[in-house]
Amino acid sequence: MNVLPRRARGVLAVALCSLVLSACGGSDGTDGTRGGYISGDGSYVVVDAPDRKDAPELEGEDLEGEPLSLEQFAGKVVVVNVWGSWCPPCRAEEPILSAVARELADDDVQFVGIATRDVAGARAFERAREVPYPSFADDAGTYAVQFADSLPTMATPTTWIIDADGKVAVRYLGPFTSESTLRGLIEDVQGSRS
């Protein structure tokens, strides 16, 4: 039994293909982007202090090959951002992250990136932009998935804010578009304890 007429099936197929292709936006790679990201909508989850789960024990190397772990920032609020130099929304939010990182550097707040896929491109991007915080080199995509037990990632970029007790307090999906939103979430976490 044919539920949809042939013409309706054709229209539906074209619409689905258009939707899929628009979600993979990007370029030919000449500008350093490759698409293949899923950007969030700026929605976020704030976990009440008693309900927070332990942050994963991320440990590895930064983009320069130096040892890096979340443990070295124990006692600080840590802002962890999953990004890629190939991701246009990630590139767009970098000035916001860097500005707030510089502003709060003396307030027991540490920023850390998780650079996915193209580590060489990420290293060049961080150097060119003078990003003031380290990023884990994550060619294999193994770091972000470690947040699955608390608040899993569903987009690139995704940002988590870990409280000073090492618990995941916030997950923000998509790029930050204002310093005040990021700063406000950090201040909320600073004012709460798990």
Language-model segment annotations:
Residues R91-E130, A140-Q146:
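Structural microenvironment flanking redox-active thiols in thiol-disulfide oxidoreductases
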Residues R127-P132, D139-G191:
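Thiol/disulfide oxidoreductase modules built on the thioredoxin-like
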Residues D48-V78:
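A short beta-strand-turn-helix
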Residues V82-G84, I114-R117, D138-D139, P175:
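Active-site-proximal beta-strand/loop segments in catalytic clefts of secreted hydrolases
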Residues M1-E59, G184, G191-S194:
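N-terminal targeting signals for export/organelle localization
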Residues S43-Y44, L68, A144-F147:
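N-terminal post-signal-peptidase region of extra-cytosolic proteins
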Residues L68-R91, L97:
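Short active-site neighborhood of thiol/selenol oxidoreductases, capturing the structured segment around
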